[in-house]
Each structure stands twice: as C-alpha cells, then as structure tokens.
Amino acid sequence: MSDLKKAAQQAINLMDLTTLNDDDTDQKVIDLCHKAKTPAGDTAAICIYPRFIPIARKTLNEIGGDDIKIATVTNFPHGNDDIAIAVLETRAAVAYGADEVDVVFPYRALMAGNETVGFELVKACKEACGDEAILKVIIESGVLADPALIRKASELSIDAGADFIKTSTGKVAVNATLEAAEIMMTVISEKNTKVGFKPAGGVKDAAAAAEFLGVAARLLGDDWATPATFRFGASSLLTNLLHTLELGDAPKGPQGY
C-alpha cells in the first residue's frame, strides 16, 4: 500500500464525520450514520447537533455501529463567554447521550485580554461531562491567528482539563492549518501527551491528512496518533479518501467542511 493510501486509511479511522448545518434533518443524520460505516472501516465518530443524538444512537445501534462515538457541539459556534450557558448546554448534551462534547473556547474574550473566563469555562464544562463524555475544546485558531494566542488558548484548555484541543468550528474563513497544528501539538508535547488534537475544516484530501499526521509523528512519535489522541473533523474529506483507496467515486461539485 502506498504512503498516500496508508494516510487515507488512517484518516478514515481517525475521522469525526461531521454535519453541522442549519438545514440538518433526521434523515441527513441517518445518512451520515450509514456513511460512517465505510468500506475501509468505521470512522471514529460522527459529530452532530445535540438534538439529533437520539436518532443517531438508534440508527448506529440498528446498523452495527455501536463502536462509532457520537460527538456534539456546545457554546457553538461563537464561543461566547457565558459560562452558565455553556455548562447548561454541555449537561444537556451529556443527558442526550453524547460520548464526546466539542465546546468552543471563548476566544474573543482571550483576544481582549481575558484569560480567566476561558480557563473557568473549560473547567466547568469538563466537570459537567463527568465520567460520561470526553471534552474537546475548539480554540478557533484561524481567528486567534497570533501564534502566542493559539499557544495560550491551548495551554489554558489543557490546564483546565480538556481531553482534546481542536483547531476550528469550520464556520470561519480560516480553519485547520499546519501552522496552528504545530503550535497546538507542541503544547501537548510539553504539557500532557495524553491530550488529543483535532484539526477541523480545510483538510480536503489524503495528502493534506498525511501532512497533519506527519506533524503529529514528528512532535509526538510515530505511534501517538490513535482515535484516543487524534481526530480529523470533516465532511467532504471522506469521499476523497475513499476515492484514494479506490473504494469510491471521485468527489463531485464544491467541497464543504
């Protein structure tokens, strides 16, 4: 198997197959669940809005997808600095049955000089997850832009108990970049290598996935990236990867997240 095909295979098994659109419906989520069981094996998770968790759980159980985790989003997509609302949303997501919660860090507050609210919000949401769900923290690196802010948001999130740090919501102009990945995984290497990393949005094909996996291997070791420590947040990426593996047709039309 070529290096590109190896990267494609690995990326599928590390994928949070995502639909976070305003026009999502039960049927779109059912279809997503079926897509998550690919000819190259299951994706690690699906990522959906909280209201769709029950139908996703029912569908995955029916199709033998019990091992596919259900991730959802809170404080999404704007990363507001109201801790109480973020906690209520996170508790509700866990009550719905989420295995994983992707919460948006209050990145605009950090840009305005407030480091405390981000730490406290992540800490409170981690407590709200309890033992029921893992917490991924979206720092919106494309808006933070400044390497020092990307580093600070990563450090605060890890110090507050994040299980993963994630680049992006996929709802802004700049999503996952190799530059942000380098900073974020450097912080992981310095602080706690059990914390995972999730690039989201903008990873379009096997070659791009291989670049992100290459940064992980260089900074954290060849065997570090597993579903417990690395995820790709993506929707259109799956079609490209299956095409690379000669298990699906080439993608048609404009490619989303």
From Swiss-Prot:
Does the keyword Cytoplasm feature in the UniProt annotation?
yes
**Per the similarity annotation, which family is this?**
Belongs to the DeoC/FbaB aldolase family. DeoC type 2 subfamily.
Name it. Answer: Deoxyribose-phosphate aldolase
Record keyword Lyase present: yes
Q: Where does the record place it? A: Cytoplasm
Which Gene3D superfamilies would you find in this protein's record?
A: Aldolase class I (3.20.20.70)
Q: Name one GO biological process term.
A: carbohydrate catabolic process
Sorted alphabetically, which InterPro entries does this protein's record hold? Aldolase_TIM, DeoC, DeoC/FbaB/LacD_aldolase, DeoC_typeII
- The EC number(s) given in the record are 4.1.2.4
Question: What are the GO cellular component annotations?
Answer: cytoplasm
Catalytic reaction equation(s): 2-deoxy-D-ribose 5-phosphate = D-glyceraldehyde 3-phosphate + acetaldehyde
Q: What top-tier enzyme class does this entry carry?
A: lyase
Q: Which GO terms describe its molecular function?
A: deoxyribose-phosphate aldolase activity
Q: In which pathway does it act?
A: Carbohydrate degradation; 2-deoxy-D-ribose 1-phosphate degradation; D-glyceraldehyde 3-phosphate and acetaldehyde from 2-deoxy-alpha-D-ribose 1-phosphate: step 2/2
Gene name, per UniProt, is deoC
